[in-house]
């Protein structure tokens, strides 16, 4: 149980409002509700102490309460300074679950809250991490690295965020007894990671032989990446831009940087709103896909003076540079739907004239007098300026997260310090849990048909190498 007032939220009085929306979301999240029904009695997460770092939304509240229903003890923070829905955080706090999340956190607050994940109210430590973007995971890894004597990197931050993060690590190293980070790393039995950026971090750590505990890559489950990343962005991107700007989308020229799953959903979102969509890509396969879908594939240099709306969706840095923004039309809209804010060179804009229009909407004026409108300071536009993906598509992602937590917790000897994905049988199970809600009726293979194509009548129906 949580200690009294073991939370930081904007207004606990919003809890009733949050609870009403959580109730509605539960109806739209059949995968999570089915998981509660299947595993509730057996309590597979009993004894698990989960440190969760994932956008504190209404949908995440349903995930948190599912984990609790399955026996877990939980502490939670948001993984983005703008993505918290304050009424969702209040409802979770009122339910007795420690949560530290406020929409519009400073970077100092963000990293302070993240550190609270690891200070359990009873003096203990978490033994599981549920992560989105990898910040909680990196807290453990970089903290242990510094504790072991390699501290030079703490004096060489490469961004404002790293400056704040490294200052926090120095503070923790001074406060905690020697060996605290080592004990924390030993305590963690595994991590499940939600998003592309965090997965890249995990694979890099594993490649270097530095991963401290087993990891499950939830992002690359088909029922996550091909649904959350694609269909979620298809609905939430334009929602964020409209709430931020009230701009007429139809007839505008929009530029999407990147044509992976997130880029595909983003381009479709803009096209469905009536935009003429340009796409940039480095990968010839993705570029060909974009062209075959009817998008004009150009470079950012070509698009900068042409487009009215710019969206980055690459997971890479410096995609929209200061020079690109100098070349844009007056009051071009610039935003990002990738996990981190470095896809746009926001740091290079700080010495220009800023005018805040409303929360998460800023107008920035260049020396020549032309302006851009920047949404969510280059952070996730769909969560900063709107409320993120709809509940139904998040149910699939979060059912994968729940199954990954169960797998890591109940089979601790099965996994080494590597990155794994969930088996296709579970992917198909997650999809199946969502069919009845939308009226889908599956066909059934006859025994002779199953034998003909070499699969079981009950699946899995595709080989592991199949690309959906």
Curated annotation (Swiss-Prot):
Record GO cellular component, one term: cytosol
Stored InterPro entries: Adenosylhomocyst_ase-like_sf (IPR042172), Adenosylhomocysteinase-like (IPR000043), Ado_hCys_hydrolase_NAD-bd (IPR015878), NAD(P)-bd_dom_sf (IPR036291), S-Ado-L-homoCys_hydrolase_CS (IPR020082)
Binding-site residues for substrate, renumbered to this chain: 57, 132, 194, 224, 228
One Pfam match: AdoHcyase
Pathway(s) of this molecule: Amino-acid biosynthesis; L-homocysteine biosynthesis; L-homocysteine from S-adenosyl-L-homocysteine: step 1/1
TM segment ranges: none
Localization per record: Cytoplasm
GO BP: any one term: L-homocysteine biosynthetic process
SUPFAM superfamilies from the UniProt entry: Formate/glycerate dehydrogenase catalytic domain-like (SSF52283), NAD(P)-binding Rossmann-fold domains (SSF51735)
PANTHER family recorded: ADENOSYLHOMOCYSTEINASE
Name the UniProt record assigns to this protein: Adenosylhomocysteinase
Gene assigned in the entry: ahcY
